[in-house]
Amino acid sequence: MSRPSKIVIASRESRLAMWQAVHVRDRLSSLNPGAEVVILGMTTKGDQILDRPLAEIGGKGLFIKELEVAMQEGKAHLAVHSMKDVPMVMPEGFVLAAISARENPRDAFVSNKYNGLDDLPAGAIVGTSSLRRESILRAKYPQLVIKSLRGNLDTRLKKLDAGEYDAIILAAAGLIRLGMENRIKSVLTAEQSLPAPGQGALGIELIDGAADMADVVAPLNDPETAHCVKAERAFSRALGGSCQVPLGGYAIIDNGQLWLRGFVATADGQEVVSAELRGNPADDEALGLQLAAELRAKGADAILEKLAHCK
């Protein structure tokens, strides 16, 4: 199969998104020395609407729609995404062709005054962008005040530094990728805050049927990460996972077994259902569906019904 002479990568224009696109560009350039690999930066609807929580404005798809249109119009060959921003059900006509090796998938505690969640006094203001983190915080730290925090990584840190929040919770991966590990006061354990499905991993999206590009990006796929993320996404998808559902799903490969943990909760954190299981990594999506079934058997449907009425 002939290799393309030019490869165009669609990306959001935030600093973190561009880091991710440059990372993929550099890898593709080294794998395809005869090709010109360029980045097409774009602003998405999710980047523009910053005054409301994601759950209110339509969720994850807001960060990828414009990139998909660019591919449909032939302006780009592929798009690079943070996997946690990719809708659980891919739009018709598009596929996830590769999932790259994962950075630290955990949540990070960031503060200028405190070293961890347990150090925060009652009434301290904590900023977060996700219902998942909000429900966890409300369940485990009811004495704290949880406020919505939108914007790109730099914007969120500026709001913290301006004193609008006593602490904020961010994905550790973004801070690490931008060389800002010094802002991390502590990394939350999976027991403290189970990560979102796909957190820390990058996904490469293509037009379905673009066999030439599928061949080009195949070397970017990390099988271990892909098994874990596929299990997490299948679990989330089976429970209607989106920005409107406080849900965590996290898998690792442990002694040759895929260990998948998951939970679903009410937004106020008062009701939480969780479970875990182990199985063959090759059965990734089946394990995700099995874990979702276990949560339903433990009462997750009642929580999902309440969430449906709250929307």
Swiss-Prot record:
It catalyses: 4 porphobilinogen + H2O = hydroxymethylbilane + 4 NH4(+). SUPFAM superfamilies: Periplasmic binding protein-like II, Porphobilinogen deaminase (hydroxymethylbilane synthase), C-terminal domain. Keywords: Porphyrin biosynthesis, Transferase. CDD domains: PBP2_EcHMBS_like. It is an enzyme of class 2 (transferase). GO terms for biological process: protoporphyrinogen IX biosynthetic process. Its cofactor is dipyrromethane. It holds the Pfam family Porphobil_deam. Belongs to the HMBS family. Monomer. This is Porphobilinogen deaminase. It comes from Dechloromonas aromatica (strain RCB).
